[in-house]
Amino acid sequence: MVPGAWHSLLFTTSSASEKEENRSQRMQLGEQLLNSSTPNLPHTFYPLTGDPSSAVHSPSLEFSVGHKGQQHKKYSSGSSRGLQLDSPREAGSSSTMLSETGEGFSVAKTLPDNVRKGSPSAEEELNTAVPTSAPRYLDGSLQAASERYYLQPQGQQLQQTTTELGSPCSIFPYAPPQHSAVYPAGGAARYPPYGSMLPPAGFSPPVCPSRPQYSSGYQYSQAPGTMYSPYPPAGTGSGLSALGLPGGGAGVRAQVFLCNRPLWLKFHRHQTEMIITKQGRRMFPFLSFNITGLNPTAHYNVFVEVVLADPNHWRFQGGKWVTCGKADNNMQGNKVYVHPESPNTGAHWMRQEISFGKLKLTNNKGANNNSTQMIVLQSLHKYQPRLHIVEVSEDGVEDLNDSAKNQTFTFPENQFIAVTAYQNTDITQLKIDHNPFAKGFRDNYDSMYTASESDRLTPSPADSPRSHQIVPGTRYSVQPFFQDQFVNNLPPARYYSGERTVPQANGLLSPQTNEEVANVPPQRWFVTPVQQAAANKLDMGAYETDYSSGSLLTYGIKSLPIQTSHPMAYYPDAAFASMAGWGSRGSTYQRKMTTSLPWSSRSSPSGFSEDLLPKDKVKEEMSSSWVETPPSIKSLDSNDSGVYTGACKRRRLSPSTSSNENSPPIKCEDIGTEDYKDATKGLGYYSFYSSS
């Protein structure tokens, strides 16, 4: 060993003795409390104590007295700065030994077992606390240091210390080596930003030096539009491409929302079907979109393209759709529908929802490129509508090859199967319930119609258990007029109209409950146009009766509650209950009124209804004559497509043969004559209900 090394060893022994002398003084400062936390602290928090128990955690643990010479040689040769321990100047001067931060470790690692081992920071702090050791530290900068925590060294010594302690900076993510502060500010703080908590693929091996690279992790996680991104354009793999910025320039992606998406989802659960006809049929639900993210000043064309959704041919079997072969890809025809308002500015398209309610689907191959822009489809094929937004150049020419100007949006819930008649009854019912025009059931209930073409809107309730829902009660504005106070006494007869009939078993005009519908044979209800009632008022002046115009409202509303009271009771019961029904003036009056008034046999005008029966008798007769009517009589009524309630009255007044030729014979030819008496009317009434 060189002589300089022996001098260094002697000096180290002397330094250790000085530490033992000042141990009691340091314990008064509370250093013993800091000693207790030593085993759990990394190198950045080594306490400044002289307790020998902390020596096991010192970086000089691997050096012993028996090998102090070898270790000193090893450490001297490995030092980057090359300790010249053979110099007499360095043997007597501590300034040279501690002139560099790293040299203090080489001396502390050769201590004997009976001497306390500690980090260089302990000696540095000891010099500050005890003035007697001041000759050992000639560097003023180190003497002025009063921090109780060890400041990270610079250069190669930091890497060696980090390796010996098992990379503790993975627990305490301090700043890179260029920082010298204990709590550096900025992105490399002790508490890193949220991005470093969730790196894309876990923490990388260089945790401490490379920690700042995670400061911007998940930089798009809080960006607007990415948490709940809309459907991206077709052909793009990221939702960010659909994020539009209003007022952006070229290449900015638009953002499209399906306005009636909940309605589409209802149909999509049962596999949506769309009717195609030769003349063209509009879609329901129709396509309606909201568009954002367009350039307000640029011009765009917006159009819908219908393409095959899959290469299969479909059929409805066993209550579900199944594939049966390959689709015909050679189908020629128009597949594009351009919105009528195209081209237009981005501000126009973003102002309100874009509806394609006039888009029509057809199976007519000859309807190519016509003015109606009908889309030609094949039956029993599944199709997918796609929305295209194409930016138009200044000269009005579209550049379909420029992907930055051509954007396509696809919504899977818009898929549908083209059919010529609805296959799934659930889809039919959804169309009826939600389509205000109720056109869906026309193609599905053709086999149920038994009447003429004018009566095609009246399917038989016996054939269709859902026919009572064909016209929802909330669809007509006349519903508020028919409250319980008006219809509770209304017999379940018909409302007549020469135009259209609507089946109602428990719908708008029916006073029956659901239980009664199940027990009473079905019958038809007629909705009378308002215009017809207005014309009826003009005809009332020619008759002998003294009616007021207020008594002739639509559907005979005034007469319904008046039936409950009859102060003039000199008319026999049979006169009111008979099918002629309107007293001695019945023949003349009925011949004039039957062609214009839609009254049923129970909806008498007020002039006669007040003179006929007491209230209790009216209720009794109505319950006996209408609720307990034999099925044959009501089947006669249900088979009639426009005659009046009294079959005998219809036969007497109709110049042609009635449609109820198959009905039971009714002996009522004499009813309604001028000289027919009240008793005869009663016999006619009872014979009418007993003949069945």
From Swiss-Prot:
InterPro entries linked: p53-like_TF_DNA-bd_sf (IPR008967), T-box_assoc (IPR032385), T-box_DNA-bd (IPR046360), T-box_sf (IPR036960), TF_T-box (IPR001699), TF_T-box_CS (IPR018186)
Region feature Disordered, mapped onto this chain: 35-135, 595-614, 621-673
Single GO biological process annotation from the record: endodermal cell fate specification
Compartments where found: Nucleus
Region feature Required for transcription activation, mapped onto this chain: 578-692
Induction annotation: By activin and derriere.
Gene Ontology MF terms: DNA binding; DNA-binding transcription factor activity, RNA polymerase II-specific; RNA polymerase II cis-regulatory region sequence-specific DNA binding
Domain of life: Eukaryota
Compositional bias (Low complexity): 596-609, 654-665
Keywords for the protein's UniProt record, in alphabetical order: Activator, Developmental protein, Differentiation, DNA-binding, Gastrulation, Nucleus, Repeat, Transcription, Transcription regulation
Signal peptide feature range: none
DNA-binding region: 263-443
A single Gene Ontology CC term: nucleus
PANTHER family: EOMESODERMIN HOMOLOG, T-BOX PROTEIN-RELATED
Job description of the protein: Functions as a transcriptional activator playing a crucial role during development. Functions in gastrulation, regulating mesoderm differentiation. Activates wnt8, t/bra, chrd and mix-A/mix.1 expression.
Protein name, UniProt field: Eomesodermin
